Amino acid sequence: MFGVRKLLVGVDLVANPENPDRFELPAPTREAVEMGLRVGEFSQAGVTFLSVIEPLPAGATEDEQAEVTASAQAALAGLLSEAAERGVQAETQVASGHGWMEIIREVLRNGHQMVIVGSRDASTASRLWLGSTAIKLLRLCPCPVWVARSNDEEKTQTIVVADDLTDVGQHCLHLGVSAARLLHARLLALHAVQYPLERHLRRIDSSPEELREYRETTCAEAEKQLNERLAMTDFRTISEGARTEITAGRPDVVIQDAIEEHEADLLVMGTVARGGIPGMLVGNTAERLLNSLSCSVIAVKPEGFVCPVQLD
């Protein structure tokens, strides 16, 4: 059930074009709010709706700042009513500063176990839709981050879970199963198989038959592990079903191809801290994917991830 008891939803507010003194929620933020309320219902989690407003220019008065804050709080008030109607315990907060920084600080202060934010804009080109706030959260936030992209299509959704057969990959499988149950989606557990000994085998003049046997054995072992790991989850409770897929190739290419082939709506993937550089993604797999993703994404940090953001 996600294992979430405290959930933080980042609420992006934009000025109402007909009344610039009032704020409203853009479509991607509405999607994030909806996902937050669903997770709150599903996991009986408390939800905090946090809106971060940009500091006013130098010279602005305290009254002007207070007026902007009050407008933001008024825009958030309706979310409390929505949450109450669905039996979700919720609260709202307004902060001033950089969105990604204040969201991470709130996670560090109050121990939120998941962050959900909206994308930049569903109509934006796919390589840009994540936006700078989402990118920084995916890289730096210590808890799982769900970047929700609005989807108007009425079809059964598909969730791809990229499992690298590590502990963080197992966490991704559990989250993917929970998301599939939540969204009534089908699940694809995916592993990009590698052949680490192939270069050595070629160097010692192994025969084509030996190389083929090595590849087949490696794939079979990976498939066995992936099925065993999926069996450790509640995948049988997914109404639309679950399956595994083993594909040879560079992980980011394999994942992107699977997303396109299956028209995936959500990718669940792990990130790994690069040695000595806190907050970076390793192996370029996740970094490459961030530039090409066309679906929503949940990014999971490994145990021991070092968040470079510190509380004052």
Residue map of PLM features:
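Glycine-rich, Arg-bearing micro-motifs that act as flexible, cationic patches
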Residues: 19-20, 117-136, 155-156, 266-292, ...
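Short, structured interface segments
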Residues: 130-151
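Structural beta-alpha unit
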Residues: 1-3, 54, 63-74, 81-115, ...
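Short, well-ordered secondary-structure micro-motifs
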Residues: 20, 60, 128, 172, ...
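General small-molecule cofactor/ligand-binding pocket signal
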Residues: 48-50, 91-95, 146, 188-190, ...
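Small/aliphatic-rich secondary-structure junction motif
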Residues: 2-62, 66, 158-212, 241, ...
